């Protein structure tokens, strides 16, 4: 048994062609949908980045009792449980929080790992002298500016390196048995720094200041800048789609669909101006943030090109992978093995929790959701009830739920 887990960061469900979006170019996600079961009601659990990864490892909600932090010594970590049971686990990622204080110790649960440097403000390349930031809207920082100088050009982008290492692993190990390859690119997380090849596909007449790193705040920028920033996300998303396509090509050529599970998922979404907000964390956890894409191919069931309405979450991935490899699921895991859902659309839960420690707490049944939002100024809690539809997609005429 073999499995590939591909986890993107900030992958917007409502910006993917198979989920009904028409303004982005994501043909390989559409191709993936034909190769797998696509879930219509997948929700995040704990936001943002590292809380979501603790859920990926433990199959348990994190935000109810703890904020951002490392894997704990007492945690049942899915990759470590596989490792102890004789399944080789390998992580390839450019997600810099894995080697930061406060977010570390996740990667050490694998048999081996490879870390690609240079994303966001990763303290990677040294530059002792002054660093001049260009005129910009939104965010920018000096370390990121230094890093950008080293990741321009063919083959230098961290995303390219991550997938290059994934192909290296597959070339070396595709004929072996009992392994999990966890591929985790940081993209399309901000900053939206994509090569011109992809930017040109979303080209416009924007002539303003650089704007590829939105603030975690209300939208206040001119409309032209807002459109430009969304196009920058689209360009990076299309680059992610292209490298997903290379992985699908590899699986086609080497007939890996016969005996290799493929899971493609994300941790959460990202607001691109919907509801008057950029980014995440501060605003209400709208559908664009909490309602996530999920694709699973399971060679045991052989089901492909179908959709599922069952309500599923991030916490279901750990028990699903453990079950796939025949490893017992610890009783403290709150997630569900999704094999039965892949076979036929059987519900596994009536409601799903999601939120962030010390902030919003939300529950959904896949049709409605209730969110308890903290009003820090009034030291009170605001209860909101909303329909589970992405009503304010910025390109509403081209997107549907």
Predicted segments, located by residue:
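Active-site regions of oxyanion-processing enzymes, predominantly non-cytosolic
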Residues: 1-5, 103-114, 142, 152-208, ...
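Polar, surface-exposed loop/tail segments
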Residues: 26, 56, 159, 163, ...
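Histidine-centered active-site microenvironments of extracellular/periplasmic hydrolases
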Residues: 24, 191-197, 201-204, 250-306, ...
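A long, amphipathic alpha-helix that forms part
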Residues: 157-174, 213-262, 324
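Catalytic-site neighborhoods of secreted/periplasmic enzymes
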Residues: 55-152
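Active-site-proximal N-terminal segment of extracellular/periplasmic enzymes that hydrolyze or transfer
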Residues: 1-37, 46, 83
């Amino acid at each position: 048994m073999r499995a590939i887990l591909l986890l993107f960061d900030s992958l917007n469900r409502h910006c993917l062609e198979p989920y009904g979006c028409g303004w982005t170019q994501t043909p390989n996600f559409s191709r993936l949908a034909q190769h797998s079961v696509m879930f219509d009601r997948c929700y995040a659990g704990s936001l943002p980045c590292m809380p979501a990864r603790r859920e990926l490892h433990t199959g348990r909600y994190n935000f109810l009792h703890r904020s951002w932090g490392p894997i704990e010594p007492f945690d049942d970590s899915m990759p470590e449980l596989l490792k102890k049971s004789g399944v080789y686990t390998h992580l390839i990622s450019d997600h810099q929080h894995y080697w930061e204080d406060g977010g570390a110790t996740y990667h050490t649960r694998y048999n081996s790992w490879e870390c690609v440097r240079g994303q966001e403000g990763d303290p990677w390349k040294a530059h002792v002298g002054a660093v001049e930031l260009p005129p910009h809207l939104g965010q920018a920082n000096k370390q990121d500016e230094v890093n950008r100088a080293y990741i321009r050009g063919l083959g230098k982008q961290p995303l390219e390196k991550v997938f290059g290492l994934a192909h290296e692993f597959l070339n070396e190990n595709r004929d072996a048995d009992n392994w999990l390859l966890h591929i985790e690119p940081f993209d399309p997380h901000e900053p939206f720094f994509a090569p011109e090849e992809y930017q040109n596909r979303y080209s416009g007449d924007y002539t303003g200041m650089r704007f590829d790193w939105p603030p975690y705040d209300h939208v206040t920028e001119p409309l032209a800048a807002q459109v430009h920033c969304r196009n920058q996300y689209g360009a990076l998303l299309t680059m992610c789609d292209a490298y997903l396509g290379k992985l699908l090509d590899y699986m086609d050529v080497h007939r890996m669909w016969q005996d290799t599970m493929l899971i493609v998922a994300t941790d959460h979404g990202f607001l691109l101006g919907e509801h008057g907000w950029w980014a995440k964390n501060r605003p209400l956890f709208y559908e664009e943030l909490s309602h996530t894409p999920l694709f699973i191919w399971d060679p045991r069931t052989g089901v492909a090109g179908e959709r599922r309405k069952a309500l599923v979450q991030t916490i279901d991935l750990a028990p699903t992978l453990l079950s796939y490899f025949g490893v017992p699921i610890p009783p403290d895991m709150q997630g569900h093995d999704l094999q039965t859902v892949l076979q036929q659309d059987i519900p596994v839960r009536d409601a799903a929790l999601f939120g962030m420690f010390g902030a919003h707490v939300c529950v959904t049944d896949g049709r409605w959701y209730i969110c308890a939002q903290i009003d820090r100024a009034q030291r009170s809690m605001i209860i909101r009830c909303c329909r589970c539809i992405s009503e304010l997609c910025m390109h509403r005429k081209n997107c549907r739920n």
